Each structure stands twice: as C-alpha cells, then as structure tokens.
C-alpha cells in the first residue's frame, strides 16, 4: 500500500450512493441509487440515447424512464444494475481508475453472506481493485461521532437497524434489524396523499413524494394531540409546488408520515418501532454496559433527519428504560452522511492499512476471504 494513494470510500445505500476519497470530510459524489431504462424506443437520429441512465441523469429524465432501485432493504437484488452504479461511480463521478485505488464498501448488518462474497468478487474481477474491505454501516457512524461505545440507530431508505458497540466491538447477537425505512415512509405518504385526492402512482411521481417528505415532514412529540390540533385549525398546513406548477396543500400528512417509524402497525407491519428496537438491542446486551448504551444512542442515516425525532426518541425510550436511567439521544447534524464520514476516517487510519483484503489474498482464497478478514 502506497501512502500517497487515496482509498475510495463508497457507501451504497438503498436510496443514495455516497462516494469519495478517504481523508475528505464529505463525499464528493452523492447521487440516487437508481438505474433508469427508457420506456419507449428512441426515434430521434443523432441523439446519443443510452440503454441505461444512472443516478441524477436518471432522475432528470425520469418522465420517460422506468426507474429501478438495485438495492432493496440494504441487500443488492440486481447485480447487473449494481455493476452499472459502481462503474458510474468510478468513471463518471469520481473519475478514477478502480485498479489504482483500494476500495472500502459498506453494508447493512445481518446481510446474507453470499451478498458480501458477490461484492468482493465483482470488485476484484470486474474492476480489478488492488485491495478492498467491507464494513458495517452503523459501526462507521459511531466512528464519525467520535465515540467507541454507543447504540447506533441507523435508518436509511431501505433498512433500519440498531447496533450496540462497546469499546469498538459490535455485539452481533444484539443487533436488531428492521426492514422499515425511508422508502416505506414515501410509499405510505403516496397512499395518504391519495386520500386527499392527489394521485401519485408512477415511479417518477414517487420521487416527487420523496421530495415533499424530505422538505415538509416532522415528528410529532405527541401524535394524538397533534392530530387534534391539525383537525381544529389549518396552522400546520404547508403548500408544495409540483413540477407542473400546481400547488398542493398538505396538513396532518406532515407528521403522520414519519410516525410510521414509531408505529409500524400504521402500515400493517408487525415489527416494532425504532424506539423499541433500540430498547431491545440494549436489553440483549450485558447488564454492566447498558447504562453506557442508554447514554449514547446515536442516530444516523437520512431517515433520522426528521425535525423533532431526537426529542421523541428521548421521550419514548425514557418510558421503556428503568426509571432512574438517563437516556441521551445524540443527533449529529451531518448524520445523513455519517456512515460515509466514518468510512473516510477508518480508511485513512495508519492502523487500518494492514486490514485490507489484497488482490493476493483474494487470488489465494476466493470470495470467502471476506468473512475472515472483514468482521
């Protein structure tokens, strides 16, 4: 490993791909993890039409494309599309030759083993990287917050999970994974906006709803009181201008949408809310370390960006925790990118340099090396 060659850090989320160089304090490229296929045949001669559009370009042309997300619930479901996204990341976004840089990738905890192996295989065989490493997202978020102990609630677009980390070690037996995240909230918002008479159905319209969700929603401190308040007056109403110039008004949808994180039964899911997941995670840990975990609940990921979520988490977890226990929720302002930032910190540490899986390691042992070298 040369010292002057920067490692590439790629955080492949279900919704957004964050990529950049180790040592930087923010990702250079952030683009949607979308592959768009044209719905119609191109007829204009001389237009350089492609067979696939990726990321922002797919987003811009979404009206004539069918959009696909290759990562669902944190797991890659379409490897051909995933290769397109990676190659777009290296060649178009970062403009680097992958064979010259070690690559750090991230993944959701409790992912299928085959998923990791396939990632490793593609990196070494398709992109010929000199070295690579796969790390669990939540652990990286904790690095970014400057802690070595804490319970991380990481909620992105496709998957949420709570991971307890003590003195830098993730405790795998206590990880709770929740397949409920930003995309489910967007779907739910599409549904409840339909009740208002606004119809959003296509993959392109879903992106509009995602934008409404990101700009206007918030978490209510007390859901029932907020519902009554919304019913009594229109003080909570906000308007949003659609791309065609029409203006729609949204009211209680603003806080009904993120409420799903705390009450998954609202969308017919039997799973527990995020506050209970964090509580279950802490309860699965040794009794001696629980206080440290309660005092360091770190939020990370885009679906923890809702205003009011920190206070609401504090309230809900204090209810569940033992009476004298102080619950402290940490909401770093850069938490949307904290997984990437943690990866950037890790890959630039001198002590990390002997951890990489090298091309030689891979040639000797094959894809299964990833389970031995990457914890």
Curated annotation (Swiss-Prot):
Q: What is its EC number?
A: 3.6.4.-
What is catalysed by this protein? ATP + H2O = ADP + phosphate + H(+)
Under the heading InterPro entries, the entry gives:
Actin (IPR004000), Actin/actin-like_CS (IPR020902), Actin_CS (IPR004001), ATPase_NBD (IPR043129)
The Gene Ontology CC terms held by the record are: cytoplasm; cytoskeleton
Statement: the UniProt record of this protein carries the keyword NADP:
no
MF terms from GO for this chain are: ATP binding; hydrolase activity
Keyword annotations for this protein, in alphabetical order, are: ATP-binding, Cytoplasm, Cytoskeleton, Hydrolase, Nucleotide-binding
**PROSITE patterns from the UniProt entry:** ACTINS_1, ACTINS_2, ACTINS_ACT_LIKE
Job description of the protein = Actins are highly conserved proteins that are involved in various types of cell motility and are ubiquitously expressed in all eukaryotic cells.
Q: Which family does it belong to?
A: Belongs to the actin family.
Q: What is this protein called?
A: Actin
Organism (species): Phytophthora megasperma (Potato pink rot fungus)
- Which lineage is the organism of this entry classified under, starting from the top rank? Eukaryota, Sar, Stramenopiles, Oomycota, Peronosporales
């Amino acid at each position: 490993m040369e010292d002057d060659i920067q490692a590439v850090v790629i955080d492949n989320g279900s919704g957004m791909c964050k990529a950049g160089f180790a040592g930087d304090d923010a990702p250079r490229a952030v683009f949607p993890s979308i592959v768009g296929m044209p719905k119609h045949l191109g007829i204009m001669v001389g237009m350089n039409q492609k067979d696939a559009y990726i990321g922002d370009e797919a987003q811009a042309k979404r009206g004539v494309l069918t959009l696909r997300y290759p990562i669902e619930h944190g797991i890659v479901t379409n490897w051909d599309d995933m290769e397109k996204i990676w190659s777009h990341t290296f060649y178009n976004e970062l403009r680097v030759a992958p064979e010259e840089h070690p690559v750090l990738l991230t993944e959701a905890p409790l992912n299928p083993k085959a998923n990791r192996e396939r990632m490793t295989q593609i990196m070494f065989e398709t992109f010929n990287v000199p070295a690579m490493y796969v790390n669990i997202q939540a652990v990286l978020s904790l690095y970014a917050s400057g802690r070595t102990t804490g319970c991380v609630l990481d909620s992105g677009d496709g998957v949420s999970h709570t991971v307890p980390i003590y003195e830098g070690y993730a405790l795998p037996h206590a990880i709770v994974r929740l397949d409920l995240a930003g995309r489910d909230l967007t779907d739910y918002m599409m549904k409840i906006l339909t009740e208002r008479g606004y119809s959003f159905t296509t993959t392109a319209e879903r992106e509009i709803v995602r934008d409404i969700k990101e700009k206007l929603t918030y978490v209510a401190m007390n859901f029932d009181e907020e519902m009554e308040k919304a019913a009594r007056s229109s003080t909570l109403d906000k308007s949003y201008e659609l791309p065609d110039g029409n203006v729609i008004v949204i009211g209680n949808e603003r806080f009904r949408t993120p409420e799903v994180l705390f009450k998954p039964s609202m969308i017919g899911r039997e799973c527990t809310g995020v506050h209970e997941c964090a509580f279950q995670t802490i309860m699965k840990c040794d009794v001696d370390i629980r206080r440290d975990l309660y005092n360091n609940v770190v939020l990370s990921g885009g679906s923890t960006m809702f205003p009011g979520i920190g206070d609401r988490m504090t309230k809900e977890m204090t209810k569940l925790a033992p009476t004298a226990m102080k619950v402290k929720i940490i909401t770093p302002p850069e938490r949307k990118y904290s997984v990437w930032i943690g990866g950037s910190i890790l890959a630039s540490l001198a002590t990390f340099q002997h951890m990489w899986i090298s091309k030689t390691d891979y040639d000797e042992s094959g894809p299964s090396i990833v389970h031995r070298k990457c914890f």
